[in-house]
């Protein structure tokens, strides 16, 4: 192809990309807006669109089937509550590379015990930023997909979790066998019975979070990584409260059998406050991979830094 032809092709490709970006629409939800309910805007959206939701409480749920969709609140007090779609949860993400921002998802309860603020069933990267999860069975439940990435940034989880279902417990975050779970700058409080974070991902990252039972939380583990995988837990503040359902361990790794390749287990620069009144193990490692613990600080009751292979420094 001659230079002129190459230049024409390059310009055409740039123009096509620009047109694709320009074609993305913002669908507005709220009183006096084009859509009265988030679910209607989400159903009408196309790939790459933004659904912008005005403050208010919406008794609504939705199934997301558009890739690269952004669902965001336009101000404080955007609440989706009291309804679950397909017997699963409030937002069911069956698409790739979706972003959910600045919402509250509240009160997801379904008969099987896994009512989720967000049920992640798609691929690519699901980004959850600035979202509050309140009184759900699962805050976020991510289905098995080895190529999926779940990123949770600057979000809050209050009163999530349940062990009411005979089939097992629900958790504030429960990631199935996905590629990566990355939770950063988020806060967990008053988790009920289940774990604050349970991850079967190939790679689990928890950084700069606060995970606290408080006086009334009844969580089991603060962080559970039952099948191994690479782990980085850094810069967090953990607190086990007096009503914890499992006072013996804060972080558990590999107790259900190691099915993920496990090359690196690093737990550093965290603080554990033990308010249980019982001796507590900070990290219980049941994999064959040595855990590296460094710079961790323990307050309150008696804390055993590590059970299982690894080093403490």
Model-derived regions, located:
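Bacterial N-terminal signal peptides that target proteins for export
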Residues: 1-9
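Bacterial N-terminal signal peptides
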Residues: 8-17
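Right-handed parallel beta-helix
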Residues: 68, 72-78, 96-107, 124-135, ...
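Extracellular beta-strand/beta-solenoid scaffold signature
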Residues: 82-91, 111-120, 135-144, 164-175, ...
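Boundary at the C-terminal end of the N-terminal hydrophobic targeting segment
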Residues: 20-24
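Extracellular beta-strand-rich solenoid/capping regions of secreted or surface-exposed proteins
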Residues: 47, 58-71, 79-101, 106-124, ...
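Residue-level detector of conserved, well-ordered beta-strand and adjacent loop positions
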Residues: 30, 54, 72, 81, ...
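Acidic Gly/Asp/Thr-rich repetitive segments characteristic of extracellular carbohydrate-active
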Residues: 26-60
């Amino acid at each position: 192809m001659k230079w002129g032809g190459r230049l024409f092709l390059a310009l055409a490709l740039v123009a096509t990309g620009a047109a694709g970006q320009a074609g993305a629409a913002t669908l507005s939800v709220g009183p006096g807006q084009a859509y009265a309910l988030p679910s209607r805007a989400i159903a009408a959206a196309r790939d790459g669109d933004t659904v912008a939701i005005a403050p208010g409480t919406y008794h609504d749920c939705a199934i997301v089937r558009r890739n690269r969709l952004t669902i965001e609140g336009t101000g404080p007090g955007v609440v989706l509550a009291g309804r679950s779609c397909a017997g699963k949860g409030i937002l069911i993400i069956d698409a790739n590379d979706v972003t959910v921002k600045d919402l509250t998802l509240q009160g997801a309860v379904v008969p099987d015990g896994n009512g989720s603020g967000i049920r992640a069933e798609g691929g690519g990267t699901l980004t959850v930023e600035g979202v509050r999860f309140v009184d759900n069975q699962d805050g976020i439940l991510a289905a098995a997909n080895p190529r999926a990435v779940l990123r949770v940034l600057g979000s809050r989880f209050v009163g999530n979790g349940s062990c009411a279902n005979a089939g097992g417990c629900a958790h504030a975050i429960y990631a199935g066998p996905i590629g990566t779970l990355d939770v950063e700058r988020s806060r967990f409080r008053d988790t009920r019975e289940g774990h604050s974070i349970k991850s079967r991902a190939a790679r689990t990252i928890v950084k700069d979070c606060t995970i606290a039972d408080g006086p009334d939380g009844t969580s089991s583990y603060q962080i559970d990584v039952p099948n191994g995988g690479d782990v980085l837990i850094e810069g967090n503040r953990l607190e086990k409260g007096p009503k914890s359902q499992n006072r013996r361990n804060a972080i558990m790794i590999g107790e259900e059998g190691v099915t993920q390749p496990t090359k690196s287990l690093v737990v550093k620069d965290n603080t554990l406050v033990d308010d249980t009144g019982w001796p507590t193990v900070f990290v219980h490692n049941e994999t064959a991979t040595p855990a590296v613990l460094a710079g961790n600080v323990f307050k309150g009751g008696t804390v055993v830094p590590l059970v299982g292979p690894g080093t403490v420094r």
